[in-house]
Amino acid sequence: ATLAVYPGEKVGLVGRNGCGKSTFLQIIAGTEEADAGQISRKQGLVTGYLPQEFELNDAATVGENIRAGAAELLGKIERFETANNLSPVEQEQLQQAIDHADGWNLESRLKILMREISTPPADRQVSYLSGGEKRRVGLCHALISQPGLLVLDEPTNHLDMEMRQALAN
């Protein structure tokens, strides 16, 4: 069977418990390898993934946990800003990658996401959050890198009705 998903489309999976929905999503997100068949996606496609059971760093703040979703981008920004021995080609490639991901606006995007998804304040310790608040932080974590593909496994777990409706839209 073939499944093709195009930009802007929403696809949902429905099936009984234990039939492999989560495993399929892990393969699509790139966190697991397929035993058979093949997955092809656009080269350089950034994927955001919120698994069914999402672990946050309880010792960190809300903001730190969300920023961790952009770790690769933050690494590129740091390398661009601190590396003195980059060739002009390497500098250009890093600049393009950062520009493409809108990396220079990461902090403003963080604030916008937190407001839109109604997360607790960025300096709040994660260990004090409810399940629904943690799920909102996890959603921001998946969205902060502006993924071209967003994979959500049981995205409405622990969310109130208002947030469930907002997520559906």
What do these predicted ranges mean?
Residues 1-169:
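ABC ATP-binding cassette signature C-motif
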